[in-house]
A protein has these predicted regions:
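Extracytoplasmic gate region of multi-pass secondary transporters
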Residues: 40-41, 226-280, 337-340, 344, ...
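Helix-breaking motifs and short loop linkers at transmembrane-helix boundaries and internal kinks
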Residues: 52, 85, 106-112, 140, ...
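Cytoplasmic helix-loop-helix junction between adjacent transmembrane helices
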Residues: 116-155
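Helix-loop-helix hairpin linking two adjacent transmembrane segments in secondary transporters
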Residues: 151-194, 198
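Multi-pass alpha-helical transporter architecture, strongest
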Residues: 191-195, 312-319, 400-432
Length: 436
């Protein structure tokens, strides 16, 4: 998986233009990944009606089907990404999950749609770990929080694209929405393969060339890193909370506040696209300043933002008023994007260069287990169980308890800060500033 034509020699300098070009390309790849993942939650209502499915079945399609292969393939693919050509892996993964997204549009029953969603999971498992590892070899450690915050803008842009599928569904049907998202990704995979170069690993870390690390080595190292453990757990609980709520928000707006799908998706697309991007860009600027002072300010910042965002998330799913719900979602959803960049940066700085892709894969393993397996299935099952008592309001009552989980995630990031100095030292990044 090595191509000399599109790989950087160890002595070849990486220009500023090349650095930012690769970052923007990878950001768009990430956006397509999130869009192809998020589109299912937007299209829950028409798919449920067309295929005559329960909330439990929809929860399975939304999360579990995607996660079955995402979480199982993620770790071995990340281990491969720490050894093989990352550019080639990203291009192949993008082409695979885009093709499977398009196939969702021609599925005729639950089982065909299930297989297609599993295929999306296999493809996406090979996307984020090599991408974040690649970014870390294009940007020096003092610029990684900034670069990975830019990369994280792909999450808000992808969620906006996925939410906008409601308009396509209203105009041409839910099948067309999948095709409109899947086909362009196949084309863009070729762009990645032809224009992105593979840099030398660890060339910007001012450290000796990294020794290849096995998955077992990474797991052993993680077990000795309290700061890394709290980051992994905090990220998992955060995704359980934020994305667990957001998977079901389009259906919640349709059922409890009687919005049509296009209007609900349109409102949410603005929250994700405009609000989320604004918060990510603001976070990028904040990270650039925090990294120059005390490294503990990064996890402290994440803990504070999550704790603050938890309050409007509770109100949004409990409020009887559509206006109040929309207002609270405008606070909760944009703020939920703030942890993306800082979390990726913490992971990259708390492990040696030889373990970066595997560290991200560990985070994705547990995070996706939480937000793709546990959250959608638990909420769907709870909604079905509560339907006899609450009717159309059963989904609201299933979501309210989940909204409180944000406080738990904030606590783990706060604990990460307490152990950060020792964690940076063990990872070989002791030069990062931690005030006494």
């Amino acid at each position: 998986m090595r191509s000399n034509a599109t790989s950087c020699n160890a002595s070849e300098p990486i220009t500023v233009a090349r650095r930012w070009y690769v970052l923007l390309i990878l950001t768009f790849v990430y956006a397509l990944s999130i869009a192809d993942r998020f589109v299912m939650s937007t299209l829950i209502e028409p798919i449920k009606a067309d295929l005559h499915l329960s909330d439990s079945a929809i929860g399975f399609l939304t999360g579990v089907a995607l996660a079955l292969f995402y979480v199982t393939a993620g770790l071995p693919l990340a281990s491969l990404a720490d050894r093989a050509n990352r550019r080639t892996m990203i291009a192949l993964a993008l082409g695979a999950w885009s093709a499977m997204t398009a196939f969702c549009g021609i599925a005729q029953n639950f089982w065909q749609l299930l297989l297609a969603r599993m295929g999306v999971g296999v493809g996406e498992a090979g996307g984020t770990p090599p991408s974040t590892s690649l970014v870390s070899d294009y940007f020096p450690w003092r610029r990684r929080a900034l670069a990975l915050s830019v990369y994280s803008v792909g999450a808000s842009l992808g969620s906006m694209l996925g939410s906008s599928a409601g308009y396509a569904s209203d105009a041409w049907g839910w099948r067309a929405a999948f095709l409109l998202l899947g086909v362009p990704g196949i084309v863009f995979a070729i762009v990645v393969a032809l224009t992105v170069r593979e840099p030398q690993r660890g060339r910007l870390d001012e450290l000796p060339p990294p020794v290849r690390a096995s998955l077992l080595d990474t797991l052993r190292f993680t077990g000795k890193q309290p700061a890394l453990l709290h980051t992994l757990i905090g990220a998992s609980v955060y995704t359980l909370w934020a994305w667990g709520l957001m998977w079901w928000t389009p259906s919640y707006l349709v059922r409890s506040h009687h919005m049509i799908l296009g209007d609900a998706g349109g409102a949410l697309s603005l929250m994700h696209g405009l609000g989320g991007t604004a918060v990510l860009l603001l976070t990028m600027l904040v990270m650039g300043k925090l990294a120059k002072h005390d490294a503990r300010l990064v996890p402290w910042f994440v803990a504070a933002v999550i704790a603050i965002a938890t309050v409007p998330s509770i109100i949004a799913y409990a409020a009887p008023s559509k206006t109040l719900t929309i207002d609270m979602l405008w606070i909760f959803i944009p703020l939920s994007y703030a942890p993306f960049g800082p979390t990726f940066a913490l992971l990259q700085n708390l492990v040696p260069a030889s373990m970066r892709a595997q560290a991200v894969a560990l985070m994705l393993f547990f995070s996706n287990l939480a937000n793709l397996v546990i959250a959608p299935q638990a909420v769907g099952f709870a909604s079905d169980c509560l339907a006899a008592r609450y009717g159309a309001e059963s989904l609201r009552h299933a979501l309210i308890p989940l909204a409180f989980v944000g406080f738990w995630a904030a606590w783990h990031y706060w604990q990460c800060a307490k152990h950060l100095a020792g964690g940076l030292h063990r990872a070989g990044n002791a030069t990062l500033d931690v005030a006494a």
